[in-house]
């Protein structure tokens, strides 16, 4: 990593004369490494397992479609209402909903023998962020 970083900095440096350039490069590499280490520490504090689980669950077409349907419906939906909208088995649909629930992306409520699902505020915010950044 340091060799590549040194080459990058060498390409960026044009302020030094030939005698000072090596010293300037070394100083800039150390400074840049310190900045990058600070960035790594700041980022590490913001990475949470629950965030990774939530984002990874959206990476599946069936689960993402379910989320889109629930957000668009703006009300809770039963599995029997979602089933005709998706090209998957009831078992696969139930499994996907269970995954979404365990990741905190949908809330599940049992009413009698029926289970209803609704999107959480967190997943609504994620969908809104995706929509807002689409080109």
Where do the protein language model's features map onto the residues?
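Beta-hairpin "wing" of winged helix-turn-helix
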Residues: 102-111, 118
């Amino acid at each position: 990593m340091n060799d590549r970083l040194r080459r990058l900095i060498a390409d960026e440096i044009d302020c030094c004369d030939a005698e000072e350039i090596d010293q300037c490069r070394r100083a800039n590499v150390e400074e840049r490494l310190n900045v990058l280490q600070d960035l790594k520490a700041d980022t590490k504090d913001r990475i949470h397992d629950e965030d990774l689980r939530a984002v990874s669950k959206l990476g599946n077409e069936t689960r993402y479609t379910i989320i889109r349907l629930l957000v668009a419906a703006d009300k809770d939906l039963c599995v029997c209402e979602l089933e005709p909208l998706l090209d998957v088995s009831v078992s696969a649909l139930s499994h996907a909903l269970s995954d979404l629930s365990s990741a905190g992306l949908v809330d599940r409520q049992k009413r009698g023998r029926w289970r209803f699902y609704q999107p959480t505020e967190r997943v609504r915010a994620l969908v809104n962020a995706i929509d807002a950044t689409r080109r």
